[in-house]
């Protein structure tokens, strides 16, 4: 027992050393310069500042991006969840080392749950955790995705442990309920916690892929029981019921995130547009073309085994001393070639661009194929099924019949994009089955004849393919990319030579790894004699060591010292520019800024200081996305053309055209240069304005079209879902969109105080008046009241703004964002998390009592 504990302790220490040794920069305080995290810092700055200063009044809304939006996908809701602190404890440490360590530990438990001996299980954990995709997403800043992937093997391990505890009787053996039930209950409790934490990472798409693996496991288990062990069906249902009930508690503990996310998603790009497209009614879900834009090509699948089969990354590194491209650029006198060599356009596959391949490891792929021919257990089938599903989903538009079936008929699938991500399923299934068969070989589970047949077939497929790549690369493509079209031919030729060289290098590497693995297995299977058991173990450990060397070496291409910076360097991108300082002198509590020095709708850095017209989010409100496509982008292009020839700021302001939709969003400043004064948009409508009429649309298509013809200063455009709203004015007839008395007489409304979740206005009106606010309408959570508590109904105006009808007099109007779903979901989280903790304690106590 002590020896066993020492082995496990040694492996854990090894994992800690590996995680921090792979990213030693974190020990000196450096962080990964993650583009997505810098974007997050910009978009969440207002929210984080407010919450830090007002811990008892946390905001669920931010005005910092896209005119305003819920913070559901930024900071979320953590109220009520008693398991949150336990979750945070697991992530203690310096990231990304803490992420890698969490993944290593979970994958190790997963391998152990399959019965793999510890030393080989450690090799399998490395194969899982150092797949190139993990390191790529760490490098770009997809931290939530990485944490979700790190928790995934914990969930699988707990589920497998639960079923094995209930069903592991040997043929003819019959354990009593006291022998199997406590361990089964404990496994279900661990499953609930692992599932709770995996969902808490907040990446539903990864959780969806986890569900595919789990369902495959359960279905195959049912078939196996029906064919082989019908007597155990009762225990299966007990284990399943425990997993279901406790799993629901784990899910329920996350209700404070899941329910607001579900409510918000209905209003976003994931919920679909109200507009008709190509004659079809508005669909609910992402557009299929958008969802499948990043589809893995059939021709890319070999890079599961040969990393640079399609060039690797769109901005990949080469050896400057050996690169034909760098040599050419040096001959032409280009400077700074050391930096250029780190970001050449090497990828030549079908995706728009990529951070790198989904490299699973040449050894892992070889072992997986070996297992398909050699392994006879049920595990082969429940691991093969999700593998095939993952490949089919990742192919996206290259395999449209399969993609359309999932998109139109499988629940929630049409909410996801970047379908190539489905290959993460293989990060688990390939190492699981591969190291399962390796463990059986080490345990002397196969005779030489069976191994020879399956081994030679697997070696021919992997090693033979790699050899063919080395000898005849021209068989596998032109090595030209679509992005090469705008380059000079001599440069394209140099890039092609580099791509072929990288292709051959990695094919040769994979050939060597597969050959070494095959040779070690052949050596392990030599005729039995004294010491043959040790020989098999040495071979297994040597193969695990090769996996470690290969996966970390390839991984360094995607996460290395060049990607780390000091905290000061990272923060420098958020220093105030002269133009920011000029804008921030404005004492008005709220106005919006259009920053043309960045990609307006794909960059959230301006949100750090300003209420930004643009930003970045794949889950922005759908109506705002419609506004971008129909009006904001055309108006921005018109603005750029109008001021393009101006020599001074005043000339640019004089040339500034009237931009009705940007103006209704209260876009007061336009940034053209970091170091110059901003343009002032004299047409901005302000924070709120009275209107005296309405134009009404019968459909959503008519509603958005009317924005282009109405005088938005004088009338409100109302959609069909607000047809009952009465605007206190004379009716607007025909095409006369502007009432004669649109401006009103002496009435005024002014924003007096701004907070992200509360707005205060003072107004004076001689009669009931309709008002439009330059604030984004959201159907759930915003309320408006007068100073005496009288509620005021809000409606949607001008496609995406808020409107209200105010009573006559001098009043204060308060708008506040307090979504009911936050209170309800926090209560559910509180109940479920408390029950989960109590049941876990009871399950642990029961197990030890039975043992005693």
Predicted features, each with a name:
Residues 366, 668, 720-852:
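Active-site-proximal, structured, solvent-exposed surfaces of multi-pass membrane proteins
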Residues 7-43, 246-260, 389-392, 467, ...:
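Transmembrane signal-anchor helices characteristic of membrane glycosylation enzymes that use polyprenol
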Residues 98-115, 364-366, 433:
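Transmembrane-helix motifs of polytopic, lipid-linked glycan transferases
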Residues 206, 236-296:
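Polar, glycine-rich mid-to-C-terminal structural blocks
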Residues 45-77, 81, 297, 309, ...:
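Extracytoplasmic/lumenal acceptor-recognition loop(s) of multi-pass membrane glycoenzymes
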Residues 111-130, 173-186:
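Transmembrane-helix signature of polytopic, membrane-embedded enzymes
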Residues 15-104, 126-138, 142-150, 282-360, ...:
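Membrane-interface coil-to-helix junctions
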Residues 125, 140-150, 162-163, 184-196, ...:
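Contiguous transmembrane helix-bundle modules in multi-pass membrane proteins
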